[in-house]
Amino acid sequence: MTPDLLRSVTSARIFDLEQLRYAGAPAHPAHAPGFNYFLHRHHARGGNEARTGASGIVVMPEHSGTHIDALAHQAENLTLHGGIHVDEGVQTSVGFRKLGVETMAPIVARGVLLDVAGDRELEPDYAITPADLARAAAKVEIRPDDVVLVRTGYGGLWSKPEEYLRAAGVSADGSRWLIEKKVRAVGADNMAFDVISAERDPELNATLPGHILLLVRAGIPILENLNLEELAAAKAYEFLFFCLPLKMRGATGSPVRPIAIA
């Protein structure tokens, strides 16, 4: 590491973009029961030495809390990204043989924040349009291979699951707008990037249309349940983005703790 690079990193501000994981945190109905932690070894008297130990077990779906979707997560007519057909040779009881999360490289990229909720409160279940995204993008340039994070404002409701699950999300046309920008990955401070409660998209014949457009057709990973509140408060619209998916063989997603350095 060069001295100039070291100075720039140590003097920068680091933003933690992960939401707190706790029992009872918001969880998508398809990924219930969400995060649970159980202490199975306890510090206790009675041993023959001074040292004691404690450890626990984490039980959670891969798509709980702040996480990234791998390309195996969604299919369109049983076809994954790249034309890979979902059959017994690809999808097994212990995971996917292709496009699992272990195939995803660590993401280190320029990141941009589109603070759609910056100047207004978005209604529950509101579908964010290309015009909304373009208006937020007036504060920052989107370049190819950027990671684009969309703030709905609902990340501040993480401690209120019922309200959080009615978050605004990006519309199908909004996802198409992002694809046209040739971004590397996208994310949002909501449960599914899309609007969870939206009706089936007539063109795609699917709910959560962004999942088909981004993951299946464009091969663009999706980050969900981000904490973007401090980033927005600091008006940090451009930053260095880091995200390291866990190498879990065959998994369709991974918990992550992304950070932004600005």
Language-model features, listed with the residues they occupy:
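Active-/binding-site microenvironments in catalytic and ligand-binding cores
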Residues: M1-A262
